[in-house]
């Protein structure tokens, strides 16, 4: 089930520096005007889960979709993007990526929310996750690169490290973590074990060149 639109396909330019992906120019192409049709929404609602993200262009349809099925949303490292506040009330599983390149944007968002000052970045991240989880998500997860991941469900905190492996190309590590986590959740695993499933999946992906 796809939409075929006239125009250029969206393109992401990526460099690999010492095994780590560095994003460059993004050409939005036909995605600039992409909208879900009624038949697309009906198709999505037939499934167990809807998975989208910051560049998915379907935040306007989330109120409809989330009434029928759970929604997983990859906010990447775009903490200050307006889509975060727009989408978060309709998201069941929220994912953020906390990395060096997003520290300034994270601090900007953190201070704009009026959250309490904390002694270090990790404590600030936890305060942010608590505030975001209260806006709607059942579970919120932040991936931390080589430091693993952290999760919060409104009652408990969860931590999982990484699976030791040879790193060839980190492209797709976050996507693979999300896929593994959601596979675990859909198969009845708890949050902790689903985080491990995500880490296992990422470890396979980053062993391949150009895995995304």
Language-model regions, residue ranges each:
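Active-site donor-binding loop signature of nucleotide-sugar glycosyltransferases
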Residues: 26-28, 96-98, 162
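Conserved N-terminal subdomain of the carbohydrate kinase-like
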Residues: 1-48
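Structured loop/turn residues at beta-strand edges in well-structured enzyme cores
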Residues: 42-45, 89, 135
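Acidic, amphipathic alpha-helical patches
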Residues: 40, 84, 167
